[in-house]
Amino acid sequence: MTIKDIAKLADVSVSTVSRVLNDRPDVSEDSRRRVRAVIEAHRYVPNNSARDLVKIRSDAVGLVVRGVQNPFYTDIIHAIEQKLDTSGYTMVMRQIPSGDDEIQCGAVMEKEKRLRGIIFLGGRSDYSPEEVSLLGVPYVCCSYTNSYGTLPPESYSSVSIADMETAYQATRYLLDNGHRRIAALITCPDDHSISQLRYEGYTKALAEAGIPLDESLVICTGTFNIQDSYTAMNRVLDSGADFSAVFAISDNTAIGAMRALREHGRTVPDGCSVIAIDGIEVSDYIDPPLTTLCQPMEEMGRRSIQILLDMIEGRSGNCHEVLPTVLRPGGSVKTLV
């Protein structure tokens, strides 16, 4: 039996049969029921693989986590797990290094585990339609969006903060506290990621304040790791660069920078002020507590999985949500006279 035979017996189109076989949400319940009845009656095995006969309908949702051991993800993952536990779905998670291709990983998982949908936790912001055509299930970009890519907004879903605006607010906070020589601790200024968006927020705030960009104060770490941030900050401090404050694109990078500053005799905040974005728990317990713009991590996880389940179960289509951040004043920013 072929897909064409199933379509004829179920009185639907071939494309409808294909969507049912791939557990796509954009099929009416009546058509889905008729197609499944034919499949079960004729014991049709998709892809000529016996393993696919075990389940016509999978209850697995994939989670691809890009950037191993990033503490920012902990609360997001917990919120996703909680929602899945109460919704009758199981979670299949893969962690990949930041340099790996999350779309390719998701496509492989989809076929191996017969996923109903995928959440990408962290990823690039420059996808093309050709890239994501590998995916046959709904997906949500969690903590980022496709700012530099060519995907039509209606073709995918995302839950994120306004990265550029949040970085602008952080830099503006330093400016309002009297700082003019402000270093930026980023991964890369042009990597088509949230780092680039936050760098653009930093440069926008400086430009509005009439402060020329000093590229010697743009510190590139290459990653969000504490160790790499510590190393990058040491390099700049050894060069004798002059700055009174640091805008770090994440709490992790700020923590690494603060250790380097301390070891160079520049205590925070008296010797140098530091502000960041994230709000991970540990940053409130370092000395001094970090001043940061907190992302609503649990809400980000809850909304991402709810949007995905709504698409899987046919309740809604693709959408985009931008969540607010909240400034948590710590003890890492000093007001200059």
In which residue ranges do the predicted regions lie?
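Periplasmic-binding protein-like
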Residues: R114-L121, A183-I186, I219, G240-S250, ...
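N-terminal helix-turn-helix DNA-binding module of bacterial transcription factors
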Residues: M1-S58, F72, V337
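Hinge/beta->alpha junction and helix N-cap segments in small-molecule ligand-binding domains
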Residues: R66-D75, M93-D101, S158-Q169, L185-A232, ...
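Short acidic capping loops at alpha-helix termini that bridge into adjacent secondary structure
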Residues: R181, L213-L217, T267-S273
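Generic beta-sheet signal
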Residues: L121, C142-Y144, I161, L185, ...
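Flexible loop/turn connectors
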Residues: A232-V337
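Alpha-helical recognition/docking segments in bacterial nutrient-uptake
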Residues: I56-R172, D176, D238, D242
